[in-house]
């Protein structure tokens, strides 16, 4: 085993860092993997990301930049849904075990429980340390009202007990790991994600409105996948409860999961039933350089999620100088400083969100002050800093003794 990290095998089984965030299985984790690996590569760590092939058009190997390659692995049918991916864990693991980039790796960084299971097996086969970022936890989602299979939770528990390091995005995720999974706090590394400040930075709202074709009235923006966890239904209900008939809500995202299309139909019907269908503007996921313009066009970015391990959308909005109104859950409590950079809503109800959003629309000077502070706060979060922390943490694992769960 090496005494430092020069080569890192990154496992992202269920979704590729090359995928468009905001639809299907693409979300904040895609951004995280892509940005973290790019920053590691720029710091001199050779990284290979292994993901399952989900399209016949995907090349077997793609070099994103020097030190950052993506390998698409054949495992199961191309169109296998995420809920069935546990069926291909053996096939995926076997393919990685024979890959020269895995055999040469100093350590493994696995993302999400499916990848964590693969990493757990490879750790023991190869005798190299395993760091795991869960991004979401089954017990947390179940507590927020989302049904999660018992298999996921039991496997998460096993991974927690054997991973050499657990990477938490913020203190609340650390607390969830220790409370819900009895994780050893000494093996938890809190590493805040970053944001690309070259893309996401303050700018002219008037110019952004012209570029997006939005009018002069109040604009609320929701960015994310159309799934119950993200709460677009709550954003629509809040719009309907507000006494601001001049306000519009832009919903930027696409359906996700096996019930995604059905949920999209439900929320569209909800907007019609509440009489605000004409004030909800539906947009597909956008490339990130275009997304930043939509952030700047907004008066408020709304993040009504049931749970979030961090909340990259909230951080991107903050970096653009836009106040965020978010649920007071998980890592959103790290990204949004309540009353300073935005507003946290402790009660996840339409009335509570309508009141918080309405208070900012009624006081543009206060909203502008929050946005300015948000941009300052966001400067604390960079991918260079996050990668340096991760590199240090994994390097220490390489010099230590592996956790043995067998």
Question: What are these regions, as identified by a protein language model?
Answer:
Residues 314, 323-326, 336:
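Short hydrophobic beta-strand element within catalytic cores of glycosyltransferases
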Residues 1-72:
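N-terminal subdomain of nucleotide-sugar transferases
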Residues 214-230, 236-239, 250:
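Conserved donor-binding/catalytic core segment of Leloir-type glycosyltransferases
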């Amino acid at each position: 085993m090496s005494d430092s990290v020069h080569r890192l095998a990154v496992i992202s089984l269920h979704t590729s860092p090359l995928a468009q965030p905001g639809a299907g299985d693409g979300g904040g984790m895609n951004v995280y993997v892509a940005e973290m690996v790019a920053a590691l590569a720029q710091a001199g760590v050779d990284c290979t990301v292994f993901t399952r092939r989900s399209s016949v058009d995907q090349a077997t190997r793609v070099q994103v930049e020097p030190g950052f390659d993506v390998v698409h692995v054949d495992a199961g049918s191309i169109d296998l849904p995420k809920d069935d991916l546990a069926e291909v864990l053996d096939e995926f693991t076997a393919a990685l075990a024979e890959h020269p980039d895995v055999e040469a790796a100093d350590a493994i960084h696995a993302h999400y429980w499916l990848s964590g299971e693969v990493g757990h097996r490879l750790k023991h086969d190869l005798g190299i340390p395993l760091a795991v970022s869960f991004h979401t936890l089954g017990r947390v989602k179940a507590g927020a009202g989302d049904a999660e299979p018992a298999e996921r939770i039991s496997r998460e528990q096993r991974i927690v007990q054997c991973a050499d390091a657990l990477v938490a995005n913020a203190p609340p995720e650390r607390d969830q790991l220790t409370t819900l999974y009895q994780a050893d706090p000494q093996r938890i590394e809190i590493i805040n994600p970053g944001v690309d400040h070259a893309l996401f930075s303050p700018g002219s709202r008037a110019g952004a409105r012209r570029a997006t074709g939005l009018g002069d009235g109040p604009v609320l923006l929701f960015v994310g996948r159309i799934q119950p966890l993200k709460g677009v239904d709550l954003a629509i209900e809040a719009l309907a409860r507000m006494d601001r008939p001049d306000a519009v809500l832009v919903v930027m995202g696409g359906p996700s999961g096996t019930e995604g299309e059905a949920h999209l139909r439900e929320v569209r019907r909800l907007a019609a039933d509440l009489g605000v269908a004409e004030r909800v503007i539906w947009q597909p996921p956008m490339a990130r350089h275009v997304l930043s313009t939509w952030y700047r066009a907004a008066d408020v970015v709304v993040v009504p999620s049931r749970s979030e391990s961090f909340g990259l959308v909230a951080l991107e909005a903050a970096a653009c100088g836009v106040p965020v109104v978010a649920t007071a859950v998980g890592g959103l409590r790290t990204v949004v400083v309540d009353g300073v950079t935005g507003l946290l809503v402790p009660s996840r109800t339409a009335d509570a969100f309508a009141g918080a959003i309405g208070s900012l629309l009624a006081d543009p000077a206060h909203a502008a002050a929050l946005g300015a502070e948000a941009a300052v706060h966001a400067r604390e979060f960079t991918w260079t800093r996050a990668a340096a922390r991760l590199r240090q943490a994994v390097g220490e694992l390489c010099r230590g003794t592996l956790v043995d769960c067998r």
